[in-house]
Amino acid sequence: IKPVLSALFKSEHFFDMLNRGCLIKTPADQVIGSLREMNVQFRPETEWDTNYGLWNTFYSWMVNMGQNPHDPPNVSGMPAYYQEPLFHEIWINSDSLPKRNQFTDIMINTGYARNGFRVQFNCVAFAQTLSNPGNPNDLIDESLGIFFRNDLSAQSKGQIKTQILLTGQQWDYYWTNAWAAYEANPTTANFNTVNTRLKALFQYFFNLSEFQLA
């Protein structure tokens, strides 16, 4: 089977752009995927009570969004995998979509704590993993490359940059200077300046419909 898989993984079909962003994420993809994309770290495996308590919280979010991995409704599994004609579109409805947005909103703003340990989307730490976070255009492009399967238009990215990272200003140095000031002197005030904008940026990204696509 190795030659078959090798040919498949190197084929044009495997990398076809039409195969990206064509399915709605499962709740598991939404929850676990966002934790991985935001580089959320848990305690060492020896601290099982803390970890399992937090993992149970995230598991409950999957259930509330419509997917209980340990208890499928019947022998056929989850309807989104077989129910015609909707299939994966079943994952999104008037109840589940607000919960998806609520989950990422909570993870950005407060997160969850157990035994004195908090897990949260650390937006500043995430930005520091990017190649050029001081450049607002590169920051947006590289972040979207991680969060989204399909890119946004140049016009949309420009509006997002101006309204959020530049706080309504027109010049990139409003963000560049703020980031440089934090990097040179990470005081609480400088941290809050960049963190507030990054939290608003990522929360906006996570609430876009494009984020729901796999």
Regions inferred by a protein language model and the residue ranges of each:
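Flexible, low-complexity segments enriched for small/polar residues
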Residues: 5-214
